[in-house]
Swiss-Prot record:
Keyword Electron transport: yes
InterPro entries assigned to the protein according to its UniProt record, in alphabetical order: NADH_UbQ/plastoQ_OxRdtase_su3 (IPR000440), NDAH_ubi_oxred_su3_sf (IPR038430)
Primary localization class, coarse: mitochondrion
Gene designation: MT-ND3
Gene3D superfamilies for this protein: NADH:ubiquinone/plastoquinone oxidoreductase, chain 3 (1.20.58.1610)
Segments crossing the lipid bilayer: 3-23, 55-75, 86-106
Family: Belongs to the complex I subunit 3 family.
Top-level taxon of origin: Eukaryota
Cellular location(s): Mitochondrion inner membrane
Recorded catalytic activity of this chain's protein: a ubiquinone + NADH + 5 H(+)(in) = a ubiquinol + NAD(+) + 4 H(+)(out)
Alphabetical GO biological process terms: mitochondrial electron transport, NADH to ubiquinone
GO cellular component, one term: NADH dehydrogenase complex
Name recorded for this polypeptide: NADH-ubiquinone oxidoreductase chain 3
Record organism: Elephas maximus
Functional summary from the UniProt entry: Core subunit of the mitochondrial membrane respiratory chain NADH dehydrogenase (Complex I) which catalyzes electron transfer from NADH through the respiratory chain, using ubiquinone as an electron acceptor. Essential for the catalytic activity of complex I.
Amino acid sequence: MNLMTTLLTNTMLTSLMVLIAFWLPQTYTYSEKTSPYECGFDPMGSARLPFSMKFFLVAITFLLFDLEIALLLPLPWAIQANNTNLTLLMSFMLIILLAIGLAYEWLQKGLEWTK
């Protein structure tokens, strides 16, 4: 019962804060607020430079592989479990999946910076 009360209270408070954040936004815009800040001086050029889509794709690929590697971090503690063979099999399958994903990215030329 205590767990249900805690979950209900947390859900209600979170929902209330989200609703307040959406209902009461500060939408007062003026030129000083929307202009880029360069150490108190007027901007020398455009601060809104175009974003490289290739950089974005490489960054997303890095994040995905980094997340999958993070799944392997608890492996030394998992090996101490009762069923070591299953743990090693699952970790080996995850490494194979990572290798297949890397090969796919390489074949699709997703890792080439210049084209």
